[in-house]
A protein has these predicted regions:
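Short acidic/polar hinge/loop motifs at secondary-structure boundaries
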Residues: 74, 101-128
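Periplasmic-side early beta-strands and strand-to-turn transitions of outer-membrane beta-barrels
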Residues: 133, 145, 152-154, 162, ...
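N-terminal periplasmic accessory domains that precede
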Residues: 61-65, 80-85, 96-97, 112-117, ...
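Face-selective signature of the C-terminal outer-membrane beta-barrel domain
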Residues: 185, 220-237, 249-378, 434, ...
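N-terminal periplasmic "start-of-domain" segments of outer-membrane beta-barrel proteins
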Residues: 23-54, 83
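Surface-exposed extracellular loop regions of Gram-negative outer-membrane beta-barrel proteins
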Residues: 274, 362-364, 368, 377-428, ...
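Outer-membrane beta-barrel signature, preferentially recognizing the C-terminal barrel domain
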Residues: 246-262, 288-292, 385, 392-450, ...
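Gram-negative outer-membrane beta-barrel transporters
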Residues: 345-352, 446-449, 468-551, 592-595
Length: 619
């Protein structure tokens, strides 16, 4: 895995080429809960910057992560709901955060990825490996933290529109303001995608049409140099046309308030996520799912000059879930935690970061202490960085897994299990990075041990599927990446990852990891004259074949083995800036015109070559 946050050029006409060294020296990350330059963080962190996002041509987080990281693949689960696999871990082990906050709502252990609007994003931080000592439950395999952009001085407005294949339409607006005391950012976005009919046979014949609204506002008032108050609010709505008779609707309302005074920060967050069934003939809708979360976070950080930073804090979370999958309607639970961390500069070129966290969950009576230890050594002239990380992961069984009682259309039942144990994991990774001027090389080896994995299997005694603790899982691999920037505006980087999974006997490989994956990206930028900049990007990805298990809907007690073929994808994007703040963009997807011979649930949802055109204006 590369530690670089994407090189090449920034997206303003005045900027020149950014080298890997410039990126490490300027990008600030929060992977250790305390802001640090990317080059100084002991935790192996991948950063996707706003410039990377604009050059990617991808309007959503799923497409962005698949393009930028070889070990990430999104597939379709039951009822065409997307599910992630990131280096051997599914949605239950990857924690998605929005500005460091958890999100309510899930389907098949995955959040609603359409909520993760990329319109006003400064960067995406990805930590691969266990991170429960910092972020608690669900971070057994990694964390994806989406950080919103901060307003620049003055008043700014940006409008954008995109049209593409399969009736793709996107419209966005962003308005921001900042002075010495007040900062505010308001963004709104509408996305629509028509139905996609697939030209060949498969596990499904079409992808449902969908459209969504996403509105967010964030305001900060600076009371003094070391004191401020921030308020935020968000609204989200999405409809999926899953049949001619009824549609699926999803809605979310979120809000938060945080205060900072010197070294103390306090936050309150509210998030309610709903699911509805909408009847086309009558125009009526019925809510059959609600997840409401209220949380409070308090954190104290004190910096000891030239020595290190001490951080301590705690969280309270009230989690309420009403679901059609429950026999009794609703359940709730409380989660309490406390954490400590010492970010220590042990020597001139040595950083050591130990951490400890305790979590307690009321519903399952689960509790866990999660330790971590991260070390960074930069020997010699500082061109080489050696990192060693150990972290424990932890995932308490959620309310659905504990209490589910769902009749699957009269075919079979899916039952929860109040006796479930918590998932635990141990992650060890070692990395070496060489960086000099305009080139870099990184190699990382990782090893994960996961105990008591939670999933459902057929239980003969109750003649249904039931959530159970599975056998131990081993996930081992190597990640190699290289990057080179050239003075004429070209940056090339490539990454290869090998992942090996070892399942316990009899465990279902429902979402297997492809053992080999490669990404190659080339960025070119040229400033013709003031305000006239051409940017071109090529993204190539190859994924190897993999064998998994498929459970039949009508015979869930029997699973068949299925081999999924290898495939490769190539995408091209071009953008040209013009005076007066206009930018024209063109994206071509699947240039190689790959069409699956059979559409499996983890096949790319493509019908061949496609593309989009976009236009934006900013003031």
């Amino acid at each position: 895995m590369t530690l670089m946050a994407g090189s090449g050029v920034a997206d303003t006409a005045a900027d020149l080429v950014v080298s890997p060294l410039d990126t490490l020296e300027t990008v600030v990350v929060t992977a250790t809960r305390t802001p640090k330059l990317l080059k100084d963080t002991p935790v192996v962190t991948r950063v996707v910057t706003s410039a990377d996002i604009s050059r990617s041509g991808k309007p959503d987080i799923a497409g962005l992560l698949e393009q930028q990281m070889p070990g990430v693949e999104f597939s379709l689960g039951m009822a065409q709901n997307p599910q992630i696999n990131m280096s051997g871990f599914g949605g239950g082990g990857i924690l998605f955060l929005l500005d460091g906050e958890r999100m309510a709502g899930e389907t098949l252990d995955n959040p609603d990825y359409s909520r993760l609007n990329l319109q006003n994003v400064d960067r995406v931080e990805i930590v691969k490996g266990a991170a429960s000592s910092l972020y608690g439950s669900n971070a057994t395999g990694g964390v994806v933290n989406i950080i919103s952009g901060s307003p620049k001085e003055g008043t700014h407005v940006k409008l954008n529109a995109r049209y593409g294949s399969h009736q793709l339409q996107s419209y966005g607006a962003l308005a921001s303001y900042r002075n010495k005391r007040i900062a505010n950012s308001l963004d709104a976005r509408f996305d629509s995608q028509g139905e996609i009919r697939f030209p060949r046979l498969g596990d499904f014949s079409r992808a449902f049409a969908t459209h969504s609204w996403n509105v967010r506002d964030r305001a900060t008032v600076t009371l003094a140099e070391d004191a401020s108050i921030t308020a935020r609010a968000g609204y989200y709505w999405r409809q999926r046309n899953s049949s001619n008779v009824s549609y699926e609707r999803y809605g979310d309302l979120s809000a938060g308030l945080s205060a900072r005074w010197k070294e103390l920060t306090a936050k309150y967050s509210f998030d309610t996520y709903d699911k509805y069934d909408y009847e086309v003939a009558t125009g009526e809708q019925a809510r059959d799912y609600r997840n409401r979360q209220n949380s409070v976070n308090v954190q104290y950080s004190h910096e000891f000059r030239d020595v290190g930073t001490f951080t301590a804090g705690g969280d309270w979370l009230d989690d309420y879930l009403m679901s059609y999958e429950f026999d009794s309607g609703s359940y709730s639970q409380t989660n309490l935690d406390a954490f400590l961390q010492w970010d220590w500069k042990a020597a001139d070129k040595v950083w050591i970061v130990p951490g400890l966290r305790y979590d307690w969950f009321s519903a399952s009576r689960a509790n866990r202490v999660s330790p971590k230890l991260s070390m960074l050594w930069r020997p010699g002239k500082g061109n080489c960085s050696l990192r060693l990380n150990y972290a424990a992961g932890f995932r308490a069984p959620n309310l659905k897994e504990l209490y589910m009682d769902f009749d699957m259309a009269g075919i079979f039942h899916i039952f929860g299990n109040p006796d479930l144990k918590s998932e635990t994991s141990h992650n060890l990774n070692v990395s070496a990075e060489y960086l000099k001027g305009n080139r870099s090389f990184t190699v990382m080896a990782f090893h994960n041990i996961v105990d008591n994995r939670i999933s459902y299997l057929w239980n003969e005694s109750i003649e249904g599927l039931q959530y159970l603790n599975l056998h131990r899982l081993f996930v081992t691999g190597v990640d190699v990446s290289a990057m080179r920037s050239f003075p004429f505006g070209l940056t090339v980087n490539g990454e290869y990852i090998y992942t090996h999974e070892k399942y316990g006997k009899g465990d279902l490989r429902a979402n297997p990891t492809r053992p080999h994956a490669v990404t190659v990206k080339a960025d070119y930028s040229h400033l013709w004259m003031t305000d006239w900049r051409l940017t071109a990007t090529a993204n190539f990805k190859w994924l190897s074949a993999v064998t998994g298990d498929v459970m039949s809907l009508f015979s869930p007690e029997a699973a068949r083995t299925q081999r999924y073929p290898a495939y490769s994808m190539l995408g091209l994007t071009l953008s040209q800036t013009f005076p007066k703040g206009f930018t024209l963009g063109v994206a071509v997807d699947n240039v190689l015109n790959y069409i699956p011979s059979y559409y499996y649930y983890n096949s790319p949802l493509t019908t061949g070559i496609g593309g989009s055109i976009s236009l934006s204006w900013q003031m």
